[in-house]
Amino acid sequence: MSPALAHHSNAQRAAAAAGIVARAGRRWGLLPYQVVVAASIAANAVLRQGKSAAGAVAAARRAARAQAGAA
């Protein structure tokens, strides 16, 4: 885990993951509504599944790549 996120609550980690995905979504080629969905999925992965922020972002990125490949 990143030292910057080591002493933060799950809610703060979820917000960080959602923010990272939201900023990176356009680079990944996502449409605006897809960015919102991906950020929400990343936040839920942290809150409900206990994933790390980095793991949640990686999962969102994999999903974005898979969707882009299917189009």
Name these PLM-found stretches:
Residues 7-27, 33-47, 53-68:
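Amphipathic alpha-helical segments in structured regions that serve as interaction surfaces
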Residues 2-6:
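Long, non-catalytic architectural segments outside compact domain cores
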